[in-house]
Amino acid sequence: MSEQKQSLSYKDAGVDIDAGNALVENIKGAVKRTTRPEVMGGLGGFGSVCQLPTGYKEPVLVAGTDGVGTKLRLAIDLAKHDTVGIDLVAMCVNDLIVQGAEPLFFLDYYATAKLDVAVASSVVEGIAEGCIQSGCALVGGETAEMPGMYHKGDYDIAGFCVGVAEKSRLIDGTNVAAGDQLIALGASGPHSNGFSLIRKVLEVNNTDTNELLEGKKIADHLLEPTKIYVKSVLELLKNVDVHALSHITGGGFWENIPRVLPETAQAVIKGDSWQWPSIFNWLQENGNITEHEMYRTFNCGVGMVIVVPADKVAQSIEVLTAHGENAWHLGEIADKADGEEQVVFA
């Protein structure tokens, strides 16, 4: 007589549907706080439905997706899960606003080997907070429990955002011309880029991240949430004819500023117009990193660069400062000669 086989369940295979349901219940309140009047329906459907906002003559949709890179590795190692969701939203919505788009709705993807409801809830609370800061609705997401795909305790997140803009007011850099001026928006820290190098610096120095730097733990400097610029920049766009915006992410100054400039334009940066926040000086010193590599990897304290007409500098800084930004005159646009770089320091 053959031995009776054990009856297996999905939970035996490592997927706990009840835990997933518990997560949905936990996050309902956070999701509800992000709602916009255009959103139709709530969580639980196969898809999310959203109307276009009123007031647009010829609306176009702008979409973006991103993650937070290996900043997540550091956050997991330090058991700091409540702010990476803000980072996730910031990386997406800041990419939309540089094209002149108002973020409309956001979806997230959370993948892990075994779902920890408390950890996942904390992450989603952060996502909801990022959505509130940027004025977009968290309309859905996917939680994937995938045994065998991740190490115990690890997870990964990705975000997807859709925004709306007036077609005639899309910002693509084509209006940038010599004589335009550059305005910087201060960063809150390294944001969500360069963390593989940051983690290498921590490793080779055997750094205790509880060590204080100017009265603040190094861990807190590094994990400070990415600044969300949406509401202040939207206000600027109502008042000033902005010619271009650049979100300073992976690739730093050298890679991101040229993305929004005509090939004939050159950004001339006033290197003495600001001081690097202390965490960047600490990273450069402890990693023996060249200045060129710093500007290629990190934002060095500048989270966004805005190109405006020369006669709009004072007004732009006034509007941005009134809406909570640390804004200053960073430089200007010049004609680029053959063979010259598109970003130079004066």
From Swiss-Prot:
Cell compartments where the protein resides: Cytoplasm
Coiled coil (residue ranges): none
GO molecular function, one term: phosphoribosylformylglycinamidine cyclo-ligase activity
Keyword Magnesium: no
CDD domains cross-referenced by the UniProt entry: PurM (cd02196)
Keywords, sorted A to Z: ATP-binding, Cytoplasm, Ligase, Nucleotide-binding, Purine biosynthesis
InterPro entries for this protein: PurM-like_C_dom (IPR010918), PurM-like_C_sf (IPR036676), PurM-like_N (IPR016188), PurM-like_N_sf (IPR036921), PurM_cligase (IPR004733)
EC assignment: 6.3.3.1
Pathway: Purine metabolism; IMP biosynthesis via de novo pathway; 5-amino-1-(5-phospho-D-ribosyl)imidazole from N(2)-formyl-N(1)-(5-phospho-D-ribosyl)glycinamide: step 2/2
Main location: cytoplasm
One BP annotation, GO: adenine biosynthetic process
A Pfam family the protein falls into: AIRS
GO-annotated cellular components: cytosol
Catalytic activity: 2-formamido-N(1)-(5-O-phospho-beta-D-ribosyl)acetamidine + ATP = 5-amino-1-(5-phospho-beta-D-ribosyl)imidazole + ADP + phosphate + H(+)
Entry annotated with the keyword ATP-binding: yes
Membrane-spanning intervals of the chain: none
Similarity-based family: Belongs to the AIR synthase family.
NCBIfam families on file: purM (TIGR00878)
Protein name: Phosphoribosylformylglycinamidine cyclo-ligase
Gene: purM
